[in-house]
Amino acid sequence: MSGHSKWNNIQGRKNAQDSKRSKVFQKLAREIFVAAKKGPDPNLNPSLRLVMDKAKAVNMPNDNIKRAIDKAAGNTSGENYDEVTYEGYAPGGIAVLVHALTDNKNRTSTNVRVAFNKNGGSLGETGSVSYMFDRKGYLVILREGLDVDEEEFMLEAIEAGADDVEVSEDVFEIFTDPATFPEVKEALQEAGYTFATAELSMFPTVYNEVAENNQTQFDKMLEALEDDDDVQEVYTNAEIN
C-alpha cells in the first residue's frame, strides 16, 4: 500500500476536523449509542469497545462516552438509527462511499444527493462503487519515542496476524483482516504498543488522481458530506499526495 498512506490523509484533514470537534463528538456519541444498544459492557460487546477506542483516540471526554452508553441502556423513547450506505462519484470519476446513521432516511438521502449534485458529482445505485473498496482493520502506531527496528516491528506485527505493514518516517500502519483485527490489536497492546488510530475502515483497491480543475468542487463536496449530522464516514479512492 506504499504511497497511499491513510495516515497522511488523516493528518491532511486534521486541522479542518479539529475546528469541528463538537460535531465529531456528536457523531461518535450516536455511534456509541447504537453500539451500546447491543450491550453496555465493552468487554462483552466488541462493537462498543471498538467505537470507544475510536472516541478516546480523538480525546472525547469520558463523561460524553458514559452519557451515550447510559442513554442507550435507559432508552425508553424508541430512539433508533438505521445504518445506510450511499455510493456515487465525485467530479472526475472519483469513487465515494458514504456511511450514515440516521433516524430519517428521507432527510439523509436528500441531503447526500444535494451534496453530490451541487458539486459536480452523481449519486449511484447500491453496488456502483463499493466493489472498489475492501474493508480492513487499521492500526497506527506513532514512531516518536519508539525504539524499535523497522524490520523487527514488521515481523512482530505479521506474527501477531497482520496482513500488511506500511512504514514511514512518522508511523507504522498495520492492516488486518476484519475478522482478526481484535486479536492483532490485543497482541500488539500486550507487547506494549499504543495506538493513535484503531478502527475498521474501507480502503480503495485502485486510486485515482483528482484533476486540478476538479479539486475545489471535490473538496466542497467532501466538506458538505462530512458536515451532515447523519454522515459518520466518507471514503474515496482519491490519490493521496
Curated annotation (Swiss-Prot):
SUPFAM superfamilies: YebC-like (SSF75625). Signal peptide: none annotated. Its main location: cytoplasm. Keywords: Cytoplasm, DNA-binding, Transcription, Transcription regulation. Residues 1-22 are annotated as: Disordered. Belongs to the TACO1 family. One of its GO terms (biological process) is regulation of DNA-templated transcription. It is found in: Cytoplasm. HAMAP family: Transcrip_reg_TACO1. Residues 1-14 have a biased composition (Polar residues). This is Probable transcriptional regulatory protein LMOf2365_1554. GO terms for molecular function: DNA binding. Pfam families: TACO1_YebC_N, Transcrip_reg. GO terms for cellular component: cytosol. PANTHER family: TRANSCRIPTIONAL REGULATORY PROTEIN YEBC-RELATED, TRANSLATIONAL ACTIVATOR OF CYTOCHROME C OXIDASE 1. The keyword Coiled coil does not apply. InterPro entries: Integrase-like_N, TACO1_YebC-like_2nd/3rd_dom, TACO1_YebC_N, Transcrip_reg_TACO1-like, Transcrip_reg_TACO1-like_dom3, YebC-like. The keyword Transcription applies.
